[in-house]
Amino acid sequence: MTTAHTLTAEGVTLGYGDRTVVDGLDLVVPPGRITAIVGANACGKSTLLRSMSRLLAPRSGAVLLDGRAVHRTPAKQLARTLGLLPQSPTAPEGITVADLVGRGRHPHQGMLSRWSAHDDEAVATALDATDTAALADRSVDELSGGQRQRVWIAMALAQETDVLLLDEPTTFLDVSHQIEVLDLLVDLNRTRGTTVVMVLHDLNMAARYADHLVAIAHGAVHASGTPAAVLTEETVLAVFGLDSRIITDPTSGTPLMLPLGRHRLAPERIDAPGGAQMTDV
């Protein structure tokens, strides 16, 4: 089992140039749990994850890992505890799958330490877990988008960190591989106690797989808590500007969001939030 770590953001303000993206945000990540961050496009989700992983320094406030500011922690030392799979990563030209996944072991290498049997085992386990072992000798350049994404996830797993941050890990994946990846993260959490923080666009997947949801709107936390507490019709309207219905997923028992558009509604009238009536058109 991994060591439990506290990861928090305290009054964090982030931005690019003259633009502020996250403003005075406070966040506590439950240790040993799976947290999903959701929100509309450009609300600050990915920016927050970049700051939590030391890639973007706050203008004010701090991101703390076990009470120490991550931006004051040496990069290699931090990488032994906290791993990141960024959005749309780029691989060096011509690198093979095995070599890329092996780079996940670099934080564990030192001036005097050499590649070990444990490193081989960590890479093999990561390849098997992501169903990419058969691709080990192929160039990453040759792979499909879905295959590449699974290889990047394998590299993150090979790093064997106690805290794992993932920015849209199901990007480019078909629905079956989306489920496989999310199941894999749950297995990692349950078997190793890994703290997982992931940005997801699919609200229903987030509610099904996360223990803790964080909904961000306009650079601040709008709501946080259990999926049942956060995924409400009021939150969906406030965060996404979308009318919806929330029902219980009959397979998982978690909240299931049904979006209400202007078309393809049932012929009978459906009450909309605020007492308005909606019909098919």
Residue ranges: model-predicted function:
Residues V38-A40:
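The feature captures the beta-strand-to-loop junction immediately N-terminal to the Walker
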Residues L164-E168, L173:
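Catalytic Walker B motif of ABC-type/P-loop ATPase nucleotide-binding domains
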Residues R114, S139-L143, Q147:
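Conserved ABC ATPase signature
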Residues S53:
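Helix-to-loop junction immediately C-terminal to a conserved catalytic motif
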Residues G61-A69, L78:
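Conserved ABC transporter NBD signature motif
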Residues G102, A117-L135:
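Conserved ABC ATPase "signature" region
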Residues L7, V21-G24:
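Conserved structural motif at the start of ABC-family nucleotide-binding domains
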